[in-house]
Amino acid sequence: MSKNKNGIHLSRRTVLASGLALGAGAFMPMARAMGPIKVAGIHGSPVENAWNSVLHKALQDAAAEGAIEYVFSEGVSGTDYPRAMSEYAEQGAKLIIGETFPVEKQARTVAADYPETAFVMGSSGTFSGDNFGTFGTWNFDGAYLAGMLAGKMTKSNIVGSVGAIPIPEVNMLINAFAAGVKAVNPDAKHLTSFIGTFFDPPKAREAGLAQIDAGADILFGERIGTADAAKERGIKSVGSLIDYTSRYPDTVFANALWNFRPILNAAIADVVAGKPVGRDYTSYGLMKEGGSDITYVKGVAPADIEAEMESIRAQIKAGTFDVPQNMDEPT
């Protein structure tokens, strides 16, 4: 870990060896022929944060396979974010991956200043021009399925969700979990709390404890730290984005997973082929595209609801069942 002259933390991963396929893979011969492209990751939170860790791992894996050279900054504040984008563009990054939720307008302005650099960002807005693409974190399919399990497991008939900020993506994820609960248990009550930031595990824990005090006996942790409250009070919890089961073996029984690699593969392929990245890459992260899923500990929920959930899961993957997409702030 080092600092550049402006104080932004930089870590470097440069791996030139190749030989492993990338999964989507069609662009790998081209990537090998022209050499790895330089990709920068700008993380608004530490890479230990669940969302950032998913991006970080996908980028590290692509570097280990020889498709890219990966450099990154973490914990970049909103005020520093546009500057970090400019710096990486000036340093020759061909593709910049990150998140522009707090700086939507400023990020697009920076991208317009560097038309030869591709920017693909987690965003609540739309793509812009030829070089600014967007993606959403749409693991709501897995959240809905986990909600089905939770709806049949709750004994108090109250479940809770702890989220970051009520932006459309977070709202949709929490609403999907609640919809899954209601699909199998219409009388269940769903509590929602937002902690006002993307990374503050102690604050998420406190929000979870408050929901438990209000009667919730299962928590959905859109934010890391929620499971700490569940563990402390001896109740069950659902994780999001990554698999928390090994970290909380007696607490987290299901996880709504999200895989950034299909989105990254598509973006790299476009850059290598010289195609514009000014498009929406969100669909590559859907369950039916292999970009998200659910993992759960079998036998924790009743067998009949596991079977019902698996039936819906198969329908989602086949494209015959659509989980409702509700981006309104949960009430």
Regions found by a protein language model. Name each.
Residues 93-100, 120-122, 214-224, 240:
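Periplasmic-binding protein-like
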Residues 1-10, 14-30:
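N-terminal secretory signal peptides
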Residues 66-74, 187-198:
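Short beta-strand elements in bilobed, periplasmic/extracellular small-molecule ligand-binding domains
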